[in-house]
């Protein structure tokens, strides 16, 4: 059983965290000899700009199109600024070219032992468990725009079509139906102001009503949802669906609840994972952390992204769950990087998780 994975380390800590994810995947292959992971490394982001002049070289894109999944580290940094050619353009391009229309970002505690690290009081944070499903290839980030050309005027445009909203709604519904009873769906918009949000709300409502009558959907204005998230996040438990820009913002807000950006994974999918073989790109929610010393970054977000990859793209559900259990066991044992109040290095955390997952699967 051979699985082809393109690795895009990216910039700064990107290589460190992807190295640790590869380490734990190889540990799984050691105890499951029928599984073989083939890793192919390519450039993206600032590293690609330095080497080739473009944030996403053609060979990286073509290799990604042929892979079973893509594992990405982190992109960007102050070195490359905000000029005409920027590292982040590589991310936008690969999402669009690979049709990665749905971004999944879980918000929960990898271990309850981390509750005291949350900026929220434990009694409010405990039990938080939702996934943000963000539409990733439409909306204002891909709309028509005008730069300031000396006239002091610039603008961006938000545009959504019914098929785009239906597609992301079906992804949210699929995820909700994976639990028994099904999870509630929360749809976030700004329908009291924006025409695109009114189309969004209408389409989400009709899609759920006609295609998934067993599910419930509740609509929430994005600003109200942002308040709920810091006041009582468990009220949003279930599946949270929203557009590209709102999803970008609300998922970053949610990411601090578990106490560290170094804990949260993400998946960007091109299709429903109904056979556990959806093509996807997996990356941590944190950035490239250019100021962080070597061997200090928390690799858990990337390792948990690899666990999502095992479950959603590589049809290795048991192994993915084992990896999540290994992470929980290691955290409970107190093996932690500095962002979690520990003193362990990046490689020490990776080593501990690799050992733990082998013990679970042996």
Swiss-Prot record:
Its cofactor is Mg(2+); Mn(2+). Homodimer. The gene is LEU2. Its EC number is 1.1.1.85. The keyword Cell membrane does not apply. NAD(+) binds at residues 77-88, 287-298. Keywords: Amino-acid biosynthesis, Branched-chain amino acid biosynthesis, Cytoplasm, Leucine biosynthesis, Magnesium, Manganese, Metal-binding, NAD, Oxidoreductase. It catalyses: (2R,3S)-3-isopropylmalate + NAD(+) = 4-methyl-2-oxopentanoate + CO2 + NADH. It comes from Kluyveromyces lactis (strain ATCC 8585 / CBS 2359 / DSM 70799 / NBRC 1267 / NRRL Y-1140 / WM37). It is found in: Cytoplasm. Binds 1 Mg(2+) or Mn(2+) ion per subunit. It comes from the Eukaryota. GO terms for molecular function: 3-isopropylmalate dehydrogenase activity; magnesium ion binding; NAD binding. Pathway: Amino-acid biosynthesis; L-leucine biosynthesis; L-leucine from 3-methyl-2-oxobutanoate: step 3/4. This is 3-isopropylmalate dehydrogenase. GO terms for biological process: L-leucine biosynthetic process. Mg(2+) binds at residues 223, 248, 252. Substrate binds at residues 95, 105, 134, 223. The record marks 141, 190 as: Important for catalysis. The keyword Magnesium applies.
